[in-house]
């Protein structure tokens, strides 16, 4: 459980398989009507809800930036207001497409090991290609220079990063990988691409966690009890707190290659260990 929660806190690429054959009865309303609620449904909700721990870690690590965003929302920081608008614009594609397609994608591909392994390999190749392009050309945006500050990001670039985040709906695709690659293509430096990715994750995961707490919170607690949920949040918080700052520093100096090769190794392991 602790290892799984650590992966989730790091926005890992390992998918959690639903246990669709196990069911429990849960009360749906005051009239004692009940419906079947699978352990798989509870586990899926759990995976999303414990991201509250990772959210808390990002808030602590980026509290100054978040404070500027808050000041911007009340008209006291122009740069904070611009960043808030960009984050909202980047969030909207995933919010809209997620509501329309997430359940369909999960139903069709959630248990498909080949789809997961393929996404791991394709994602790795994209990371290697984009990283080589960045290093060889010193720029990958249509602008003549690389953005050096999140203040330089435009609404159009933010929306583009938001569409990259939608790619993470495909099982085996990392949300952070997709948005960092999107940030590269938008012209951000590795450091600022990672920072924007984490801030966007704060918005996206907060919305997803809040939605699952409202829609599935009571049933999830009945299925899994409260202690594993609290433990999951704590472990996700600690692992994210330890990893995020290291990740940003490493990415600034070395780029994405290491994580691309990790995905390839992981894809091989997934096929060998879980393939049929």
Residue ranges and their predicted role:
Residues 1-276:
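Multi-pass membrane proteins that catalyze or facilitate reactions on polyprenyl-/lipid-phosphate substrates
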